[in-house]
């Protein structure tokens, strides 16, 4: 086991303080950790003092999300507040490749609707099949025209005396014709 070093407490945390209260703390440079040790979970390999690196703070996910969101918004507004170049005071000037964004109001980005949308007969909650047919080009039933297919009659069950029911000859199947019509139409 290691021996506690000079000024280390019983937990192994280095808590050495300056001798008088008027002396400023010297800035402690943090050395960059070698790339081999970045995957280590040992706090001393992260380049931080053990007392700082081993602090665990319980936080709810919604609180963490809110903090991250506000930090990102703060960074965004801070970035927007800084002039990016000295010629930004010119009207209509922006850096090449920069995206012009509207000033952030109460609602953020406004969604612009197409003309005519959101007015008239548009109702929420209607499915695609339940929407009114008005306004469609071609009227109801617009689409490819295919001739109606006649399904073959179901197989007849033998009568109780073993004879088939007397029916006329079965009509020929029309499925090959319908397929040909569809192909020629397109």
From Swiss-Prot:
Pfam families listed in its UniProt record: C19orf84
Q: Give the UniProt subcellular location, in the record's own words.
A: Nucleus, Nucleoplasm
Gene (UniProt): C19orf84
Look up the domain of life of the source: Eukaryota
Region (Disordered), start-end ranges: 1-42, 89-186
Polar residues biased stretches: 13-22
Which is a GO BP term held by this UniProt record? transposable element silencing by piRNA-mediated DNA methylation
What GO cellular component term, any one, is given?
Answer: nucleoplasm
Q: What is this protein called?
A: piRNA-mediated silencing protein C19orf84
Please verify whether the record's keywords include Hydrolase: no
- Keyword hit for Nucleus: yes
Q: What is its main location?
A: nucleus
* UniProt feature, compositional bias: Pro residues: 24-36, 145-157
Q: What does this protein do?
A: Protein adapter involved in piRNA-directed transposon methylation by connecting PIWIL4-piRNA and DNA methylation machineries. The PIWIL4-piRNA pathway plays a central role during spermatogenesis by directing transposon DNA methylation and silencing, thereby preventing their mobilization, which is essential for the germline integrity.
Q: How does it assemble?
A: Interacts with SPOCD1.
Q: Which organism is it from?
A: Homo sapiens
Q: Where is there biased composition of kind Basic residues?
A: 114-126
């Amino acid at each position: 086991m290691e021996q506690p070093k000079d000024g280390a407490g019983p937990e192994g945390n280095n808590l050495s303080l300056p001798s008088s209260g008027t002396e400023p703390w010297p800035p402690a440079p943090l050395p960059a950790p070698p790339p081999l040790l970045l995957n280590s979970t040992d706090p001393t390999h992260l380049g931080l003092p053990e007392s700082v690196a081993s602090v665990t703070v319980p936080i709810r996910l919604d609180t963490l999300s809110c903090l991250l969101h506000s930090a990102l918004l703060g960074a965004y507004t801070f970035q927007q507040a800084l002039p990016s170049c000295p010629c930004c005071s010119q009207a209509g000037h922006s850096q090449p490749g920069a995206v012009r964004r509207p000033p952030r109001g109460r609602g953020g980005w406004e969604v612009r609707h197409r003309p005519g949308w959101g007015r008239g007969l548009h109702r929420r909650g209607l499915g695609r099949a339940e929407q009114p047919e008005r306004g469609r080009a071609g009227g109801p039933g617009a689409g490819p025209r295919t001739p109606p297919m006649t399904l073959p009659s179901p197989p007849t069950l033998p009568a109780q005396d073993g004879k088939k029911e007397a029916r006329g000859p079965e009509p020929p199947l029309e499925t090959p014709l319908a397929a040909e019509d569809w192909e020629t139409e397109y």
